[in-house]
Amino acid sequence: MITLHMVVLPFLITLFLLLIIKFLPMNVPDKEKLSPYECGFDPSGSARLPFSMKFFLVAILFILFDLEIILLFPLAWALNSQSHSNAIILASVFVIILTLGLIYEWLKGGLEWTE
């Protein structure tokens, strides 16, 4: 009975959804759908503007350190358990590795904005 619910049923649902997608009408792109929308005005320039690679690198670093904070949030629940030292050691190692990565990026000039 468990096999039916855990293997066969998801397979049948997936097959059903694939069949529905096969028979739905396709969206055919044309010139109007692919053009940028500018509130009824004629486009003044290209919609694909280049951006600075420095901005891209800083954005990636921001995402990495934002994820660090998210991964450290469960530390509060880990400190409620009996093994405080294990949680603190793991969090410290995690922060030290990310700090070493930040120092490496700083020394390589990845945080310098001037071009």
From Swiss-Prot:
Subcellular location: Mitochondrion membrane
Catalytically driven reaction(s): a ubiquinone + NADH + 5 H(+)(in) = a ubiquinol + NAD(+) + 4 H(+)(out)
Keyword presence, Lyase: no
Gene Ontology terms: cellular component: mitochondrial membrane; NADH dehydrogenase complex
Pfam families linked: Oxidored_q4 (PF00507)
Protein family membership: Belongs to the complex I subunit 3 family.
Role played: Core subunit of the mitochondrial membrane respiratory chain NADH dehydrogenase (Complex I) that is believed to belong to the minimal assembly required for catalysis. Complex I functions in the transfer of electrons from NADH to the respiratory chain. The immediate electron acceptor for the enzyme is believed to be ubiquinone.
Record-given protein name: NADH-ubiquinone oxidoreductase chain 3
Lineage: Eukaryota, Metazoa, Chordata, Craniata, Vertebrata
